[in-house]
């Protein structure tokens, strides 16, 4: 199978380049990550992240034939050759297919991704009704792979100002949580021309999410809440 892979080491290379590979795959190699691991045996200088191999950790997110995705759940049979692999767009390249996720996680942490509740804790846990719990479906499953945010032009242009689809999806996950008591502060922190409203609903984030989530709906709901409290 033929591959064309982005190669760049900022400490050694003057500019990025593409390197071509043609390797024979084992019949058991079904996913793109399997092929990358086999390529790593052939060329141990190739750098990429991976961990769980199950689409849970989000470590092996990359741009695959022009579309962001996870290597571990991308079936080789679905890919046209040569398979072109690039690092996630919009983030600094550390080396080859590895990007610096610092800005992505800075925006994520800025939305306070945890429950805020200063009420005296109950003897047991803070309970939710089945309906309240169900309202979090489609929100809590985010694995922070950054496929969505790095597919978003607004995040490319303003990574230091726009929270991005992943961060805003998680912001709504806590806004929608019946156990949280920080609603007004959460909305106040997003009341900004850039942090929330740079989303133009082009839905690239929805198209690439490996978990099938819909950040655009979550972002739209936050915008609606902003408008309602302003009138």
Regions found by a protein language model. Give the residues of each.
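Ferredoxin-type iron-sulfur electron-transfer modules in oxidoreductases and energy-metabolism complexes
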Residues: 30-43, 86-231
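Short, contiguous acidic and Ser/Thr-rich linear segments
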Residues: 19-30
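Short, structured protein-protein interaction patches enriched in aromatics and acidic/basic residues
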Residues: 52-61
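Active-site phosphate-binding and catalytic loops of NTP-dependent enzymes
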Residues: 43-49
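A generic structural motif
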Residues: 75-76
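Short strand-turn-strand beta-turns centered on an Asx-Gly dipeptide
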Residues: 24, 63-67
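Eukaryote-biased recognition of intrinsically disordered, low-complexity regulatory segments
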Residues: 1-21
């Amino acid at each position: 199978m033929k591959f064309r892979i982005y190669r760049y080491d900022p400490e050694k290379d003057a500019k990025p380049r593409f390197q071509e590979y043609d390797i024979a795959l084992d019949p058991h190699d079904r996913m793109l990550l399997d092929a990358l691991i086999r390529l790593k045996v052939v060329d141990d200088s190739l750098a990429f992240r991976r961990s769980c191999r199950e689409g849970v950790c989000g470590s092996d997110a990359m741009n695959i034939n022009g579309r962001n995705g996870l290597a571990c759940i991308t079936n080789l049979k679905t890919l046209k050759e040569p398979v072109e692999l690039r690092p996630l767009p919009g983030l600094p390249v550390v080396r080859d297919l590895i990007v610096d996720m610092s800005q992505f996680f800075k925006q994520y942490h800025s939305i306070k991704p945890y429950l805020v509740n200063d009420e005296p804790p109950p003897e047991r846990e803070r309970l939710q009704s089945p309906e309240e719990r169900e309202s979090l479906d489609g929100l809590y499953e985010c694995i922070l792979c950054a496929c969505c945010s790095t597919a978003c032009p607004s995040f490319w242009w303003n990574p230091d100002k726009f929270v991005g689809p992943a961060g805003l999806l998680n912001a709504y996950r806590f806004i929608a949580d019946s156990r949280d008591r920080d609603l007004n502060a959460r909305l106040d922190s997003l009341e900004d021309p850039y942090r929330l409203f740079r989303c133009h609903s082009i839905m690239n984030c929805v198209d690439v999410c490996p978990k099938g989530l819909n950040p655009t709906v979550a972002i739209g709901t936050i915008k609606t809440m902003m408008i309602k409290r302003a009138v």
